[in-house]
């Protein structure tokens, strides 16, 4: 499972489409080395499952004559993989090389000679200088998920030394070279099919990648592959769609991802870059779903605040409100007028939002009487961070500007309301928004993957997550 998850990460090789990615991932040489360390234990267990068929035959041995022999119940008792490597193969995938490997086997022997004499015993076999080399081709299926296969496999068994115990072991020792060769050939024939099956066994696990990850009731994010990987001698760069969609309705936003390149960093195992396009596609999705609206009532204002949502408070700034609607509570509807825009600059994330604020007086019968509509322009700074396997954030207010859209109570000075709406934004809207942002959204993930030693940088038009990885199962 661990090896398949790591190969899956290498395997996120996108389908060939003429679009830019929203998310890029880089797997470095350090990451491949970690994958090799994890994978050897899995391969070692696979090699222990080798089944060597029973071997029998006849051999003329001087001075006895014709001897019938059989070797049976051969079992692998130990496997050693002291030397291995996992290297990049530009344009294909990765190359797995295993050298100086050894097997230890135990089995039973039987002989019959001079027509009537039978004997039996056990034997131990040491297979040394075993080498396996295979290229693991990594492609994508029709759904954008990875598929792996073993190609160009080669296996050799350098030597097989057998030692017989019990009975007429001396007799077997007379023709051990014939037995050695037979066992060596039997093992060598099984190596590459075993490797191919082991690689194919990864594919069901690769299907578990979160190619389409649910965020919440409104949105999901797609991590399908959009282009072939760029494989160099030091890393693999690959491209994911990285686009938010409304659940059940994949509508493209009125903007496209811009091209961007990763900096030459290879200190971590993995780099995940998230473009401004990805975050702006989220803003488009939530705005389209109508999720970027909020009714604000007086009970949402802290009790200690002198500002209350009632016609008395607002009447101090707009006398007509208190005169026409005396002694009534109020309600505000804050709603985005267009998609918020997120920009990334070095060490800086800014969100610009254009909204409307509609103020209502709440009549005794709960009917809402509109008072005015304000245009609200806000700028907030965002702090982005990694939480588990999710990307989360928090915002603080930079500035706001109010203009009058519509008034149902006559003309008034909008600037007189600035202090009220500063409070409303800081103590109600921003905290509610931050609760949602703290939940974050899923990053590309495989199996039981954990990010460690994580650092996040904000660069021009994208942010870069450098991290090491641990697999817990």
Curated annotation (Swiss-Prot):
GO terms for cellular component: extracellular space. This is Bactericidal permeability-increasing protein. Its main location: secreted. Residues 225-230 are annotated as: Cleavage sites for elastase. The keyword Glycoprotein applies. Induction: Up-regulated in response to pathogen stress, such as exposure to lipopolysaccharides (LPS) or S.iniae culture. PANTHER family: BACTERICIDAL PERMEABILITY-INCREASING BPI PROTEIN-RELATED, BACTERICIDAL PERMEABILITY-INCREASING PROTEIN. Belongs to the BPI/LBP/Plunc superfamily. BPI/LBP family. Disulfide bonds join 153-192. The cytotoxic action of BPI is limited to many species of Gram-negative bacteria; this specificity may be explained by a strong affinity of the very basic N-terminal half for the negatively charged lipopolysaccharides that are unique to the Gram-negative bacterial outer envelope. Exhibits neutralizing capacity towards P.aeruginosa lipopolysaccharides (LPS) and has bactericidal activity against multiple drug resistant (MDR) P.aeruginosa strains derived from people with cystic fibrosis. Has antibacterial activity against E.coli, but not against S.iniae. May serve as an alternative to antibiotics in people with otherwise untreatable multiple drug resistant (MDR) bacterial infections. Can escape recognition by human anti-neutrophil cytoplasmic autoantibodies (ANCA) directed against BPI. It is found in: Secreted. Residues 276-446 are annotated as: C-terminal barrel. One of its GO terms (molecular function) is lipid binding. Residues 28-209 are annotated as: N-terminal barrel. Keywords: Antibiotic, Antimicrobial, Disulfide bond, Glycoprotein, Immunity, Innate immunity, Secreted, Signal. SMART domains: BPI1, BPI2. GO terms for biological process: defense response to bacterium; innate immune response. The lineage of its organism: Eukaryota, Metazoa, Chordata, Craniata, Vertebrata.
């Amino acid at each position: 499972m661990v090896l398949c998850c790591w190969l899956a990460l290498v395997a996120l090789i996108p389908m060939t489409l003429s679009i830019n990615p929203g998310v890029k991932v880089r797997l470095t040489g350090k990451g491949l080395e970690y994958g090799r360390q994890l994978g050897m234990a899995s391969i070692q267990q696979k090699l222990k499952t080798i089944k060597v068929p029973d071997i029998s035959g006849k051999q003329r041995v001087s001075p006895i004559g014709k001897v019938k022999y059989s070797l049976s119940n051969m079992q692998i008792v130990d496997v050693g993989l002291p030397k291995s490597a996992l290297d990049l193969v530009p344009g294909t995938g990765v190359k797995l090389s295993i050298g100086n490997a050894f097997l230890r086997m135990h089995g039973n022997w039987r002989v019959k000679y001079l027509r009537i004499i039978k004997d039996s015993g056990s034997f131990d076999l040491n297979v040394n200088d075993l080498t396996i080399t295979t290229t693991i081709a990594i492609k994508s299926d029709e759904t954008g998920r990875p598929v792996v296969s073993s190609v160009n496999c080669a296996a050799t068994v350098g030597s097989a030394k057998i030692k017989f115990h019990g009975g007429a072991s001396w007799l077997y020792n007379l023709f051990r070279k014939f037995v050695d060769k037979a066992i060596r050939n039997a093992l060598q024939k099984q190596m590459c099919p075993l490797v191919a099956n082991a690689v194919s066994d990864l594919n069901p696990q690769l299907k578990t990648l979160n190619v389409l990850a649910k965020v919440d009731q409104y949105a999901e994010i797609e991590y399908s592959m959009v282009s072939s990987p760029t494989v160099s001698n030091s890393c693999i760069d690959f491209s994911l769609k990285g686009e938010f969609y409304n659940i059940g309705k994949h509508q493209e936003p009125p903007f496209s991802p811009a091209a961007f390149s990763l900096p030459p960093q290879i200190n971590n195992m993995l780099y995940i870059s998230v473009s401004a396009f990805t975050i702006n596609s989220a803003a488009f999705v939530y705005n389209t779903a109508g999720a970027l609206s909020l009714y604000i009532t007086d009970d949402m204002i802290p009790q200690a605040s002198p500002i209350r949502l009632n016609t008395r408070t607002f009447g101090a700034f707009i006398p007509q409100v208190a005169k026409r609607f005396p002694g009534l509570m109020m309600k505000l509807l804050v709603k985005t007028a267009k998609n918020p825009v997120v920009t990334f600059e070095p060490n800086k994330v800014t969100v610009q939002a254009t909204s409307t604020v509609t103020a209502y007086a709440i009549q005794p019968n709960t009917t809402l009487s509109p008072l005015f509509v304000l245009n609200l322009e806000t700028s907030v700074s965002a702090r982005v961070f990694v939480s588990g396997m999710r990307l989360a954030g928090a915002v603080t207010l930079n500035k706001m500007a109010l203009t009058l859209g519509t008034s149902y109570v006559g003309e008034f000075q909008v600037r007189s309301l600035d202090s009220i709406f500063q409070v409303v934004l800081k103590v109600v809207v921003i905290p509610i928004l931050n609760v949602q942002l703290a939940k974050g959204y899923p990053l590309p993930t495989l199996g039981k993957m954990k990010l460690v030693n994580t650092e996040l940088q904000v660069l021009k038009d994208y942010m870069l997550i450098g991290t090491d990885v641990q697999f817990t199962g």
